[in-house]
A protein has these predicted regions:
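Intrinsically disordered, low-complexity linker and terminal tail regions
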Residues: 141, 300-305
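Residue-level signal for mature regions of secreted extracellular proteins and peptides
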Residues: 146-147
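Conserved NTP-donor binding/palm subdomain of two-metal-ion nucleotidyltransferases/polymerases, i.e.
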Residues: 1-122, 128-133, 151-152, 157, ...
Length: 432
């Protein structure tokens, strides 16, 4: 099979094509299965199997049964994670922390009904902010709207009380604020489940105790950039938009990013993984559906504006594609956004009216080549496999070699990556 035939199969799954343009042999069906496996699209791929079966393009029975069994497992797993996200959000909010589910389960509602529970899920990523920070931002927003100087929020405005170990019989509490409150809260959760192991902490998240075997990453920063200037802009932008995301509740019992924030956040997520271990088509499919939902909000917003109204979530203005691109360019991702548009067009046959910018064919071909070689998060990339799976030094050299491939395309982010990695090692030693 040619590469385009695999893409046509995915286009059938997402509803952009009725059938395939080539005859599919039994061997080809097995190739399609392996392709979906590499890209973590088994569940979505089975939807294409069902649609093709309805038009007379039949998958071998044994493979179809195997495929269906895996799709059912994915559906049950999604139901479980949705329930766990709801429970986690309720517990954290009871304890004084606002939450917003990112990535995996945060993307499910963007998918159409027939695909929603067939998205292959992994762990739970939750963006967490103490209530005090949210209230402070609202104060500042009200001040800005009234043309006053920003109201400053002191620690007296609130905090999160964390039980600490003192060696005494009575429990003592210390009040923490901001990022420190999130970190100490998660550490307390580890103590409550009897874990003496220090949780792994990184610049943007800390690993919380598992929920019935499901890994949980608690983000005090939703994402980051290697360049100090771009990272400063990114952190400021997401801080300004945190409150509306925390309040964007769904019928599932947890909040997700608003459509406008998500179309920015998901691009940052893609860019980060492009520099890290690699990207897969599952992440690109997430962005495909995020774009469609955002575009529908923009169209609805235009209708409301004609009536003198605008809204998203709780009254937050919907970002136009020009505004989205202005934000992404300020993060150094303008060229990458064009590459993503190219991949979405080639793989999913996305309509041009969903574009946030013109496709960049040159960078898009590079991105698509990386995706096809590496599979989901680069797990199937055989280039320099010995270095990748070696010790700390070998892995560091592998990562440097990978980043150097991107220097010509994204020089600022690529050249800052080794510097950030060294700095981050020191940061983890100080904060771990």
């Amino acid at each position: 099979m040619e590469e385009k035939d695999y893409f046509e199969f995915l286009q059938v799954a997402v509803g952009n094509r009725k059938s395939l343009s080539v005859r599919v042999s039994d061997a080809d069906w097995h190739r399609l299965f392996e392709f979906c496996k590499r890209q973590a699209l088994i569940g979505v791929g089975f939807t294409a199997v069902e649609k093709l079966h309805a038009v007379g393009v039949v998958c071998p029975a044994a493979l179809r049964m195997q495929w269906m069994a895996l799709a059912l497992q994915i559906e049950r797993r999604n139901d479980l994670l949705n329930e766990q996200c709801s429970q986690l959000a309720g517990r954290y909010e009871h304890d004084g922390l606002s939450t917003c589910i990112l990535k995996g389960q945060g993307n499910c509602l963007n998918y159409p009904e027939e695909l929603r529970n067939r998205r292959q899920c992994g762990d739970i990523d939750v963006w967490t902010v103490p209530f005090e920070n949210e209230e402070c931002r609202l104060k500042k927003q009200r001040s800005a709207a009234e043309g006053k100087a920003n109201e400053e929020c002191s620690e007296a405005d609130g905090g999160v009380a964390i039980a600490v170990q003192t060696g005494k019989e009575d429990v003592e509490y210390v009040e923490y604020h901001g990022r420190k409150a999130v970190i100490e809260y998660v550490r307390m959760q580890h103590r409550l489940v009897g874990s003496n192991v220090s949780p792994i902490i990184r610049y943007h998240h800390i690993e919380a105790p598992k929920i019935d075997g499901t890994e949980v990453e608690v983000h005090f920063r939703p994402c980051y950039a290697h360049s100090p200037l771009k990272n400063w802009r990114m952190q400021r932008w997401f801080k300004d938009h945190a409150d509306v995301c925390m309040k964007n509740k769904t019928h599932m019992g947890f909040a997700v990013p608003t459509a406008s924030v998500n179309v920015v956040y998901q691009m940052c997520h893609l860019f980060s993984h492009y520099f890290d271990e690699g990207l897969g088509l599952r992440q690109l499919m997430d962005y495909y559906f995020a774009l469609r939902v955002w575009h529908n909000d923009v169209m609805e917003c235009k209708d409301l504006q004609s009536q003198g109204m605008w809204s998203e979530g709780l009254g937050t203005q919907v970002l136009s594609k020009e505004e989205v691109m202005a934000v992404l360019r300020s993060f150094g991702m303008g060229k990458f956004a064009g590459a993503v548009m190219y991949v979405l067009h080639e793989v999913f046959a996305i309509s041009s009216h969903y574009y946030i910018c013109a496709p960049n064919e040159k960078e898009g071909k590079k991105l698509l080549e990386e995706i096809m070689k590496g599979g989901n998060f680069g797990q199937y990339d055989t280039r320099d496999a010995g270095m990748k799976r070696g010790g700390m030094i070998k892995h560091g050299l592998w990562k440097l070699k990978r980043v150097l491939r991107l220097v010509r395309s994204y020089p600022e982010e690529a050249l800052w990556e080794p510097v950030f990695r060294v700095w981050h090692l020191g940061w983890r030693l100080m904060n771990g």
